[in-house]
Amino acid sequence: MIGDSVDIEMRVYEGAQATINKIFITGNDRTSDHVIRRELRTIPGQKYNRSELIRTQRELSQLGYFDPESINPVPVPNPQNETVDITWELAEKPSDQVELSGGWGGYFGFVGTVGLSFSNFSVKNIKDFSKWRPLPVGDGQKLSVRVQANGRQFQTYSFT
């Protein structure tokens, strides 16, 4: 068979490297924007870099406030002015903990522990009741309260 091949010539013209223009954050109902923005390696004015996008995705995942599978950076290029806008799509996950334990010892009787830990607490929002869910949240601070006691001699109170 003669003439069974096709020659294709492709020409790619590379433009200038895009600069990051705007950063948008969606899906953060509890966590404040400034907590997320301090983890971003993709900053407006810098050149777009895919490895920094991946690094930011990993660091947002390590905060523990978001579902790692749902952290999705969406770059939107604008070829006219050689910029790119990035939208960070996030989905928050529960990160608070409740600890309850109890037991019975022969001499001491009942032994018990009650604890609460909030990993996205906000001291700044204590006076702003609209930010309470059920406590003030959003600034990435940790609050932990724990009480241990037995029926006779031993009690421990912890607040950090």
Where are these regions (language model features)?
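Residue-level signature of outer-membrane beta-barrel architecture
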Residues: 118-120, 149
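A short, contiguous, amphipathic alpha-helix enriched in charged residues
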Residues: 112-117, 124
